[in-house]
Regions:
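Short amphipathic C-terminal alpha-helix that caps PH/PH-like domains
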Residues: 546-561
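Extracytoplasmic
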Residues: 218-526, 534-548
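Active-site-proximal, structured, solvent-exposed surfaces of multi-pass membrane proteins
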Residues: 380-382, 562-667
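Membrane-embedded transmembrane-helix bundle of lipid-linked glycan/lipid transferases
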Residues: 1-247, 308, 319-324, 331, ...
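A glycine-rich phosphate-binding loop feature that marks nucleotide/adenosyl-phosphate handling sites
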Residues: 96-101, 260-267, 571-574
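Intrinsically disordered, low-complexity coil segments
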Residues: 64-65, 126, 331-333, 524-526, ...
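Short beta-strand micro-motifs in enzyme catalytic cores
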Residues: 358-360, 518, 529, 581, ...
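Ser/Thr- (and often Asn-) enriched beta-sheet segments in non-cytosolic proteins
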Residues: 27, 207-210, 214, 316, ...
């Protein structure tokens, strides 16, 4: 619905942009401002996309003789329209997809890409493939003709249409990943924006003779006819999806999870929750959820058949019922017996099995929270990959080691630093030394150590990561007196640009490279508890699961991939009250201390305030024992008000500037 409303408003916005751009009518700025505000509160991601599309259109429309004043005023007006809605905008940008890590955001972006062979194939709609993205061969042909034949000042929309078409292809994804605001670059959704500016340029093509105008209209209409057969879009819910939704609804006490990578369609998101049904972990627009990262990792675990992680984290999310689409079992060589064994480790029992789906039920209270003890914590940008491979580790909430207290980190057996950051290297090194002295095993992934601000070298605790490039596979490793071989690098990473270790006194692992023995693993000269690992070996193991690499990584970390965190289910109750909720934990086992952190299995929201201590742990709301009263408070209200004031002031300045320029022009 929000996208439909935006599609309705977009032509009017483009009209006002055209009026000011071509005729410099000041009243058009009011239209741009109001429509930008309306679209902002309708769909924040779409206004970001429209802003990007408008910027590109105005960039292509720029002509030296005309200057850039009008283009700048239009863009500034749109920015002010967004800022004026700051009271709503600032809270909406907190959490969800805006805070999604780059890897997860990249996976979402991939879902909104399409090969040219599909996006320019009109037969897909005729053959019944209604789910395929179709850009429009007619739009492409007319855009090419417009670029070649239209007036230079009136072809910007044609250029934009072709540029957006190219940007919808998977080949461009590596570039888009590195762009600012990449979370908003769901490229196939830019199509409606491309259409809007395309039709603007088509209307402006004044030299187009009447026969060619008629021919253009005919081409567009003929291309659109298959899309007008609306009955083919009235598709009944997938029978398997309906059946699974009913199965989950009838067997769930607290929350259900369907692991199907959305292959069963959108119905389960609706069907599980209807008729007095159950809560649901996913939901069709899960990308905007506070638990978007958690959900993305569950999907990734299913794709990689990492069932230990999938089912353990399902407990963390409060799923007492988990259904797995059977077509994904075996994709990486696992069997249903392997899945059942992983389920048993997390307390699940296989209760239903068909050729379509298998259903697992958690043994425990109907409504429960979770107390968890992890073996270790991974701090840094690449934490998620490590936790997928070693589920007994948790991913830290921050990549900056200085955001943690030493006492907090001392509660873990192992701390892994991979892609981490710090404010001052000296303080970070002191923290690591202190942890090691207290008996904590600290593993430093030297491949992703921050570069020194002065020397630009990747150095930490006197150990340096030196660049090296390997082809196809690692050399044979010499580790702990044993020769260890590994399989090749992933096909898309055949050239492995990484680094070896120098400066370490106690080398534990070496490899031969150009007649030299170079180090890839070592321990600190002052503490056996500090371990260095290079060659991006941790990442390699996380993506390949190679048995040779597993031997080394398992020894360095001191844990097995099969290990799981220790979880205890606690009976819990929650009740929504007027303007808040009450969470009660009265029946905690005797071995659970009063100071225990209890994951309520409810997503943490920034609207929660309480006189009791509440915490955000891995995007979940955590409380203590007893009764916790939580009130709902409008989040980030005053920062939002400040942003709105900035927007009003900015628009006032733009209006004054536009009036002055108009007066000068009139004189």
């Amino acid at each position: 619905m929000p996208r439909m409303v935006v599609s309705f408003l977009l032509p009017y916005l483009i009209y006002f942009i055209w009026v000011y751009l071509r005729e410099e009518k000041r009243w058009a700025l009011a239209g741009i401002l109001i429509l930008t505000m309306l679209i902002t509160v309708t769909h924040i991601m779409m206004i970001a996309m429209i802003g990007i599309g408008t910027f590109l259109f105005l960039l292509f429309d720029h002509h030296r003789k005309m200057g850039i004043r009008r283009q700048v005023i239009i863009l500034l007006t749109m920015i002010c329209g967004i800022l004026i809605m700051g009271v709503w905008l600032v809270p909406s940008l907190s959490g969800g997809i805006s805070s999604m890590d780059s890897e997860a955001a990249s996976d979402v972006m991939t879902m909104w890409m399409s090969d040219l062979s599909s996006s320019l194939n009109p037969l897909n709609r005729i053959n019944g493939d209604i789910g395929a993205f179709y850009f429009g061969i007619s739009v492409v042909l007319l855009s090419i003709a417009g670029i070649l034949l239209a007036d230079n000042k009136k072809k910007s929309g044609f250029i934009l249409a072709l540029v957006i078409l190219v940007l919808t292809t998977p080949d461009v994804l590596p570039i888009l990943r590195k762009m600012p605001m990449s979370q908003a670059l769901w490229m196939t959704r830019f199509t409606v924006i491309a259409y809007g500016f395309f039709f603007l340029s088509l209307i402006e093509w004044e030299r187009l003779r009447k026969p060619f105008v008629i021919a253009s209209v005919i081409i567009l209409v003929v291309d659109a006819i298959p899309s007008f057969t609306f009955e083919r879009y009235s598709v009944p819910a997938n029978d398997d999806g309906v059946a699974v939704a009913g199965l989950l609804r009838d067997n769930t006490s607290q929350r259900a999870s369907l692991m199907d990578l959305s292959s069963l369609g959108s119905y389960p998101s609706y069907g599980v929750c209807t008729d007095g049904g159950a809560s649901y972990t996913f939901g069709w627009a899960w990308q905007g959820a506070a638990t978007a990262d958690n959900i993305m990792l569950l999907n990734q675990a299913l794709e990689n058949e990492q069932y230990d992680y999938l089912l353990d984290r399902s407990v963390e999310l409060g799923d007492d019922t988990v259904a797995i689409d059977r077509k994904y079992i075996g994709a990486k060589g696992k069997t249903l017996d392997d899945v059942t064994a992983s389920a048993k480790k997390s307390g699940y029992t296989l209760t239903y099995e068909s050729d379509k789906v298998c259903l697992f039920k958690l043994d425990g209270p109907e409504k429960f929270g979770v107390v968890t003890q992890y073996d270790g914590i991974v701090i840094g940008d690449y934490a998620d990959g490590i936790t997928l491979a070693f589920p007994s580790f948790k991913a830290g909430m921050s990549s900056n080691i200085e955001d943690y207290s030493t006492d907090e980190l001392k509660s873990y057996h192992t701390v892994i630093l991979t892609g981490f950051s710090y404010d001052t290297r000296q303080k970070a090194e002191e923290m690591v030394r202190s942890l090691a002295d207290s008996g904590v095993n600290v593993v430093i992934d030297m491949t992703h150590v921050p570069a020194d601000s002065a020397t630009r070298q990747h150095v930490f605790l006197g150990v340096t990561d030196m660049s090296v490039s390997l082809k196809s596979s690692y050399p044979i490793f010499s580790y702990d007196g044993e020769q260890i071989s590994t399989t090749g690098f992933p096909d898309d990473m055949s050239e492995w640009n990484t680094g070896y270790i120098t400066g370490a006194m106690n080398v534990t692992g070496t490899f031969a490279y150009e007649m030299e023995q170079l180090a890839f693993a070592a321990t600190d000269e002052n503490s056996q508890n500090i371990k260095y690992v290079g060659l991006n070996l941790l990442y390699y193991y996380s993506v390949t699961g190679d048995s040779g690499a597993e031997k080394i990584v398992e020894d360095i970390l001191g844990v097995c991939p099969e290990d799981l965190p220790e979880r205890t289910l606690i009976p819990i109750s929650s009740e929504i009250t007027d303007g808040g909720m009450v969470i009660t934990v009265n029946d905690a086992p005797a071995d659970i201390a009063d100071g225990a952190v209890i994951n309520t299995t409810l997503a943490y929201q920034d609207i929660f305030v309480s006189d009791s201590e509440i915490m955000d742990e891995n995007n979940m709301l955590c409380v203590g024992t007893g009764v916790t009263n939580i009130k709902f408070k409008y989040p980030l209200f005053w920062p939002g008000v400040l942003v709105s004031i900035v927007g009003f002031c900015g628009m006032s300045a733009i209006w004054i500037l536009a009036c002055k320029d108009y007066g000068k022009k009139k004189d």
